[in-house]
A protein has these predicted regions:
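Membrane-proximal intracellular helices of multi-pass ion channels
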Residues: 1-479
């Protein structure tokens, strides 16, 4: 374990957090709010810890995957705790656990909230709450990699630990260049959505907050009804962008480099759009009697399907009142999630495709025991290591899911609330059903249950293993 480089990286996360908080201070100044002190205090704390840790570069830059996982997990814990300080000091969320819940939900792009009334919050707090989605969407360590040569030739171990999906690949030979490309695409798409929303007459502050949530696939709304009170134009634009942010970003790089055929032949993306289209049509047919016509049912269905499968969590209607078939489809989409290499959460479409192909292979072996069958995705043979890691991931995922449902059941809420609460947090979605539906929140849970759900949100965003490593004694051995 290279403790020095880990503390150096975590120190830079403290420094970055201080820089990030400058924007909500500017927001407070613009709107004449008194919450500047809360953010200034948080900045002083962050710099007071971060600057000493980054004053001297580490001499030993050997950095293995275990070090990367620990650095990433600790960095996200640091983001969560320091990010909660303004909520507590401003009085917006007085209790530390509630504040950490809200902050973790923001950075992990979950969008689950303990707040029943968000419209009364100061603009600076609302801005910070939404901005955490954008920061966490692509990953703060990936952002750090795009700025600083942190770990010599060992960048990939850091990127692999934070990036979602069963495997992580470089777009170009240099990892730092890959990180810059990813953030360039991320920023470019963010600016595009801002422009489109402004053209539709959406106020600038609302535009920024909605876009931060869309880009990070987060879902914190600044209205009590999420996006329900905005125009159809705003909802349609947001639908398109949240679906686009759920696509593997490598496809956009291929398009930018004019490799159109390769981009449109990515198997995961074809499944992704196929699942979305099928779900939209089924739900639109099932809910058509609840709207003024099929066109409106289709539009509302498209928004909710896009929001759930990408794990954004915005809503334009109370789908808690939808028929059982529609709600069942949405719950299934919670688990499927977005594409690997996107800002979305969930199990990921690539893993679902892999499981389906593995199941088909096993079925074929029953019929033809001597046949030699290989699993291929995008014309490439999937390695046994990838299959093994996928199976282990799903096994641990199931254990955490069941354990979390059992623990929060101590609060004596109904099964659907408990089940979808864990599904919504472990898959980084936000709203569930019943008490935690799109018009509800997580405030009713005990602090024990909120702590469990905080763990689930972090585990879901970090794909479980980096966070779990913190709890193993062998992780902390020097050699």
């Amino acid at each position: 374990m290279n403790y020095r480089i880990i503390t150096y990286i975590v120190g830079w996360v403290f420094n970055l957090q201080a820089i990030f908080m400058v924007l909500p201070i500017l927001t407070a100044v613009i709107y004449g709010e008194k919450d500047i002190f809360a953010f200034f205090t948080a900045i002083i704390i962050c710099l007071g810890i971060g600057l000493p840790l980054t004053r001297k570069k580490p001499s030993n830059k050997v950095f293995y995957i275990k070090d990367g996982c620990v650095a990433v997990a600790l960095s996200w814990v640091v983001l969560s705790i320091t990010g909660a300080i303004p909520f507590v000091l401003s009085g917006s969320i007085p209790h530390p656990i509630d504040a950490i819940f809200e902050t973790v939900s923001g950075f992990t792009t979950t969008g689950a909230s303990i707040l029943a009334e968000v419209e009364s919050l100061p603009k600076s707090i609302l801005f910070w709450r939404s901005f955490t989605h954008w920061i966490g969407g692509m990953g703060v360590l990936v952002f750090l990699l795009s700025l600083l040569p942190l770990a010599g030739g060992y960048h990939m171990n850091l990127m692999r630990a934070e990036s979602p999906g069963p495997s992580v690949s470089k777009l170009v030979p240099k990892v730092q260049s890959t990180a810059k490309i990813l953030y360039g695409i991320y920023l470019g798409m963010t600016v595009l959505q801002i422009i489109f929303l402004l053209l539709g007459g959406v106020p600038l502050f609302d535009t920024l907050c909605i876009t931060f949530g869309s880009a990070g696939t987060g879902g914190f709304g600044i209205k009590n009804d999420s996006l329900g009170s905005y125009s159809t134009y705003c909802q349609v634009v947001t639908t398109i962008f949240i679906i686009l942010f759920g696509v593997n970003f490598s496809a956009y790089y291929l398009i930018l480099t004019k490799k159109f055929k390769a981009a449109f032949h990515i198997e995961e993306i074809r499944y992704y759009f196929g699942i979305i289209l099928a779900s939209i049509i089924l739900i639109a047919i099932n809910t058509r009697h609840m709207f003024s016509g099929f066109a409106q049912a289709f539009q509302q269905s498209a928004f909710q399907v896009g929001s759930i499968i990408t794990t954004t969590g915005y809503s334009t209607t109370d789908f808690n009142q939808w028929p059982a078939l529609s709600k069942t489809i949405l719950v299934l989409l919670m688990f499927i999630g977005a594409c690997a290499g996107s800002t979305g959460g969930g199990i990921k479409v690539s893993r679902i495709v892999l499981l389906l192909k593995a199941a088909r292979k096993e079925f074929q072996l029953y019929l033809h025991p001597n046949a030699v069958k290989k699993i291929k995705i995008d014309q490439k043979t999937v390695s046994h290591e990838t299959l093994r890691s996928t199976n282990i991931f799903l096994s641990v995922y199931l254990i955490i899911f069941c354990g979390s449902v059992l623990l929060i059941s101590l609060d004596n809420f109904d099964l659907i609330t408990n089940f979808t609460s864990v599904a919504a947090t472990l898959n980084n979605i936000g709203p569930g059903l019943e008490i935690v539906g799109p018009m509800g929140n997580f405030s009713s849970f005990s602090y024990l249950s909120k702590s469990v759900l905080i763990f689930d949100m972090l585990a879901g965003r970090l794909e479980i293993f980096p966070l779990l490593l913190l709890f193993f004694k062998n992780t902390w051995k020097k050699f």
